[in-house]
Amino acid sequence: MIGRIYGTGSYVPNRIVDNNELSKYVDTNDTWIRERTGIARRHVIEEETTSFMAVQAAKKALLQSEVKPEEIDLILVATSSSETIFPCTACIVQSEIGAVHAVGYDINAACTGFVLAFQTAQAYIDARIYKTALVIGADSMTNLVDWTDRSTCILFGDGAGAVLLRAEEGKPCLMAAHSDGTKANALTGMSRHHKAVTSLEDKITYVHMDGQAVFKFAVRKVPEIIEELLADASLGVEEIDYFILHQANKRIIEAVAKRLRLDLTKFPMNLEEYANTSGASIPILLDEMKRNQRFQRGDKVVLAGFGAGLSWAACMFEW
């Protein structure tokens, strides 16, 4: 069984912060940011919350798929920036969209989260436990960054994306995933310390990243897991139509394409407009591509996420 994508949806805040505006707060400029990241602007929340964005993306996916909320069996939300530790964001989404028969829970795996959530939904569907699943990636990353830290504030934006999966007969989704907790300190967010014993001056609650370590990890491990995934099905990388990678950095995506000896046209990007939206980046891109009719039935599509943990995951399915 395969969970076929019947609908997609996305939401990004109206407020746009471009690179020129950022240069008012930190020592940077548009050229410097574009050359190193490929990012030109990012959408930033004002009154929105992570759950609000997730709900908007979910409603669009439902509308496109023509699936009724009460038909949904499972809601998974990949997020590392929910406004509450509990209840989970998925339960808020369930209530807001009226998915009265669905079970919902969150997956906290940062930028790898959406791929892991997608894999989880596919596994439930392949096991014939659930027939209809809503998988969402939503993050409010700009709440977590230090706007005086040039190494991180230029990278992130906010948004949400959703896909609606329905069970069909077909080849199951191929899946692979790994973690390396020994390198957890390379990319961290929030704090192990209670808010009462920290102060804004400590800055320990913000995102901290060893950019060089994360870059080296991504350009090595992402090609490896893609090749591992496809080898299990005796497929070559050249047989894949699209590689939808987490939209972290243009240089990372270019390096992955180069290591796989593939043309960059197989690696769609939208980070110029949205920056790194963490768990939301892949479903936002999927939604854009579907709305622009980029996919044809039978296309072989690889999703690959990578990030904090350190963690990395990939899956392949036919559209």
Question: Can you say where each PLM-predicted feature lies in the sequence?
Answer:
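Condensing-enzyme catalytic core mediating Claisen C-C bond formation in acyl metabolism
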Residues: 1-47, 149-216, 220, 224, ...
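Conserved catalytic cysteine-centered active-site region
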Residues: 34-36, 40-52, 79-133, 258-285
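Buried hydrophobic positions in well-ordered alpha/beta secondary-structure cores of metabolic enzymes
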Residues: 5-7, 33, 61, 75, ...
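Flexible, glycine-rich active-site loops centered on histidine and acidic residues
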Residues: 126-160
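Conserved beta-ketoacyl condensing-enzyme motif
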Residues: 5-7, 47-108, 229-230, 235-253, ...
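A contiguous, well-structured pocket-lining segment that forms one wall/lid of small-molecule binding clefts
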Residues: 202-271
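Catalytic phosphate/nucleotide-handling subdomain of diverse soluble enzymes
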Residues: 287-304, 316-319
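Acidic, glycine-rich active-site loops and adjacent beta-strand->loop/helix elements
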Residues: 11, 78-83, 109-112, 137-142, ...
